[in-house]
């Protein structure tokens, strides 16, 4: 948090602010009258004074003084100092909003400085201040509109804990998550998908109908994102579950297809295709891309169930020629779906580890069995060590006279 320590009186700050603008106006040959400002100051209408001077002077500063960042930032620093002398929360919010709106009006003009000033405004409030939400939203929007995506990406790393600190409403969460998702929709699709999921997580069974368009979108994304191999988390979202029973045929089919990619195998996908031959293209999916992904997912499932997998079994499951098996295994390894070694002599894939597409009761049972085996192995090893200690030959010494 930025701490403002200013021993000047309000009257001195007002005069400094007006004098600062007056000097800049004269330098640029711009007509300027302080009468309106002085009336507001004289009547102690601080909020109106701050709102008016921010509205009137921001555009001038960024157009006529664009080569003097120091003068512009100095103006807003005085504004912030006065702002934090206000005691009424509503008044603070009015001025804060005026600053946000004025800086966001022309986002592409001197955007870096505007982002810096908004950041100063954000940091001037306590970490748990509710004011921070609206400022942060404006910051993200401004950075997006001015194509400063790396700034946005850097700022959102702690977003969930911040939202908790600010005690925001569900609607505020949705608004921010949706904004961030849309910002990265074209250029960083995985990040966009993650925030779309966060957005949909805020819906319950009662209001899921409101999110149908976005639920369809998240299902399609889970299929089209080639680097996304685990998507069973979508099955737990009420907004996505609502699609299953939708009266809109395309919505229910999208859910069915998403579920195949989340939990099922190649044969289920081929059956779906046979029943709905043109559906993939209608929702913007490539048949070849989908076929490649479902084969990789099917391979992950197969290799998660056994540690030694014959080429012939992989060939049968993926419906490919046996000579293509090694290529598919290598592709799966490059995508971090599995870690394995190819035994070309015996035509077997020796699996070290494989991605679990789902983690349900069956997987917990497998994990429990493995822990039991490890526990037994460790117990036997400890027993061997203990036996070695007790049977160890004790050294003897020759006695000398």
UniProtKB/Swiss-Prot annotation:
One function term, GO molecular function aspect: translation initiation factor activity
Cited Pfam families: eIF3m_C_helix, PCI
Domain of life of the native organism: Eukaryota
Record-annotated PCI domain positions: 188-356
InterPro entries: COPS7/eIF3m, eIF3m, eIF3m_C_helix, PCI_dom, WH_DNA-bd_sf
Gene Ontology process terms (BP): cytoplasmic translational initiation; formation of cytoplasmic translation initiation complex
Keyword presence, Protein biosynthesis: yes
SUPFAM superfamilies, alphabetized: Winged helix' DNA-binding domain (SSF46785)
Compartments where found: Cytoplasm
One term under GO cellular component: eukaryotic 43S preinitiation complex
Keywords: Cytoplasm, Initiation factor, Protein biosynthesis
HAMAP family (alphabetical): eIF3m (MF_03012)
PANTHER family associated with the record: COP9 SIGNALOSOME COMPLEX SUBUNIT 7/DENDRITIC CELL PROTEIN GA17, EUKARYOTIC TRANSLATION INITIATION FACTOR 3 SUBUNIT M
Biological role: Component of the eukaryotic translation initiation factor 3 (eIF-3) complex, which is involved in protein synthesis of a specialized repertoire of mRNAs and, together with other initiation factors, stimulates binding of mRNA and methionyl-tRNAi to the 40S ribosome. The eIF-3 complex specifically targets and initiates translation of a subset of mRNAs involved in cell proliferation.
Subunit structure: Component of the eukaryotic translation initiation factor 3 (eIF-3) complex.
Record family assignment: Belongs to the eIF-3 subunit M family.
Protein name according to UniProt: Eukaryotic translation initiation factor 3 subunit M
Species for this entry: Dictyostelium discoideum (Social amoeba)
Phylogenetic classification of the source organism: Eukaryota, Amoebozoa, Evosea, Eumycetozoa, Dictyostelia
């Amino acid at each position: 948090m930025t701490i403002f320590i200013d021993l000047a009186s309000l009257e001195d700050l007002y005069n400094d602010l007006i004098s600062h603008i007056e000097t800049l106006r004269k330098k640029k040959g711009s007509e300027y009258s302080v009468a309106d400002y002085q009336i507001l100051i004289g009547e102690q209408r601080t909020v109106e004074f701050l709102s008016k001077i921010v509205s009137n002077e921001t555009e001038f500063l960024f157009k006529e003084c664009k080569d003097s960042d120091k003068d512009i930032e100095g103006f807003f620093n005085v504004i912030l100092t006065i702002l934090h002398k206000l005691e009424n929360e509503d008044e603070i919010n009015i001025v804060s909003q005026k600053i946000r709106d004025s800086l966001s009006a022309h986002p592409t003009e001197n955007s870096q400085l505007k982002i810096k000033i908004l950041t100063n405004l954000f940091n001037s409030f306590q970490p748990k201040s509710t004011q921070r939400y609206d400022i942060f939203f404006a910051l993200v929007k401004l950075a997006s509109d001015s194509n400063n995506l790396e700034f946005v990406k850097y700022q959102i790393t702690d977003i969930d804990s911040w939202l908790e600190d600010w005690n925001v409403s569900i609607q505020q969460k949705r608004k921010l998550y949706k904004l961030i998702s849309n910002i990265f929709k074209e250029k960083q699709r995985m990040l966009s998908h993650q925030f779309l999921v966060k957005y949909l997580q805020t819906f319950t069974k009662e209001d899921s109908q409101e999110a149908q368009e976005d639920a369809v979108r998240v299902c399609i994304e889970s299929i089209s994102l080639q680097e996304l191999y685990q998507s069973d988390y979508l099955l737990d979202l009420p907004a996505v579950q609502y699609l299953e029973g939708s009266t809109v045929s395309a919505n229910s089919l999208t859910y069915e297809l998403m579920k195949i990619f989340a939990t099922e195998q190649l044969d289920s996908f081929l059956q779906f295709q046979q029943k709905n031959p043109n559906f993939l293209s209608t929702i913007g999916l490539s048949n070849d891309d989908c076929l490649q992904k479902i084969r990789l997912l099917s391979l992950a499932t197969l290799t998660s169930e056994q540690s030694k997998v014959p080429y012939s079994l992989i060939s049968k499951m993926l419906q490919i020629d046996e000579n293509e098996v090694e290529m598919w295994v290598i592709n799966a390894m490059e995508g971090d779906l599995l870690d394995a070694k190819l035994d070309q002599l015996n035509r077997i894939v020796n699996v070290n580890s494989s991605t679990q597409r789902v983690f349900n009761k069956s997987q917990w049972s497998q994990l429990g069995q493995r822990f039991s085996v490890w526990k037994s192995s460790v117990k036997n090893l400890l027993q061997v060590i203990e036996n070695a200690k007790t049977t160890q030959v004790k050294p003897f010494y020759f006695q000398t006279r």
